[in-house]
A protein has these predicted regions:
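Membrane-proximal soluble regions of multi-pass membrane proteins
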Residues: 29-85
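Long, charge-rich boundary regions
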Residues: 9, 71, 75-143
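Functional transmembrane core segments of multi-pass inner-membrane proteins
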Residues: 109, 114-221, 255, 261
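Interfacial loop-to-transmembrane junctions
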Residues: 190-192, 224-244
């Protein structure tokens, strides 16, 4: 249901709530990703300052506002808090707003929001330890399965197109990586990246999955040039490309096909 059916004030309130939820989930998945990367229990452990170990209270855990109110420093020891925490909260908040504007109040919007949170979490882990835990991949697959009955696409079509997208993109990257591994004599693409391509392919379907693959390579190349490193974690690039394609990939595919039809 498009939010345009509501009056302007209600539309604004919906978008504000979407931004707030995005910021909250960004805080959660950023924390979870950081703890997993450090080998800590992300379920039972309480949030603490990484520098002084002080247990954080409720006022220290309000997304965006807690960071701004302390000028990006720990309230107890004055240690600097990475600005990446603030950036992730703002960006995911904006992304949630875009999801609502694109899909309205729908299962597609909720699916997109949930997947973007998972992608943020696994990107944090990949950036820290160059590894994508299988738990994120499994969670993504489960998310795809449980939302099939609620999206607008007929369930059988959703299953067929999703599996085809996952197998084509994930399987294709597996074959290509094996070929490059043989040629170069070293690993070109990690197993976690291939699994991630499969998982995101379930959501994107074949055409948008291919577009996401191209965007992933472009974003990855941008990271290489920007960071001036020969080796980078590819998970964040795949995640960024997936999030963009989820919102606007169908438009790009329709435009491209329209050039030939």
């Amino acid at each position: 249901m498009s939010i345009t059916v509501f009056d302007p004030l209600t539309q604004v309130m919906i978008l504000i709530f979407a931004f707030a939820f995005g910021a909250v989930f960004a805080s959660f998945f950023t924390c979870m990703g950081g703890r997993i990367a450090q080998g800590r229990d992300w379920v039972k452990e309480r949030s603490t300052c990484d520098s002084c170990g002080h247990v954080l209270g409720a006022r220290d855990l309000v997304p965006i506002f807690s960071y701004l109110s302390t000028n990006g420093k720990c309230r107890y020891c004055g240690a600097k808090i990475p600005i990446s925490c603030l950036v992730s909260e703002v960006l995911l908040g904006i992304y949630y707003v875009l999801c609502v504007l694109r899909f309205g109040i729908s299962a597609e919007a909720l699916r997109c929001m949930a997947l973007s949170g998972l992608l943020l979490g696994l990107s944090i882990v990949d950036l820290e330890i160059y590894e994508i835990p299988d738990g994120f991949i499994i969670a993504g697959i489960v998310l795809w399965v449980i939302t099939i009955p609620f999206v607008q696409t007929p369930w059988l079509t959703e299953v067929k197109q999703g599996l085809l997208g996952g197998l084509l993109i994930g399987g294709g990257m597996l074959v290509l990586s094996l070929i490059f591994d043989q040629i170069s004599g070293k690993e070109s693409l990690g197993g976690g990246d291939i699994k991630l391509f499969f998982m995101t392919g379930l959501f994107l379907k074949p055409a948008c999955g291919l577009l996401s693959l191209i965007l992933s390579c472009m974003v990855g190349l941008g990271f290489v040039l920007l960071l001036k490193k020969s080796k980078i974690p590819f998970g964040p690039a795949i995640s960024i490309a997936t999030c963009v394609t989820l919102l606007y990939g169908s438009y790009a595919v329709e435009w491209y096909l329209g050039l030939f039809l």
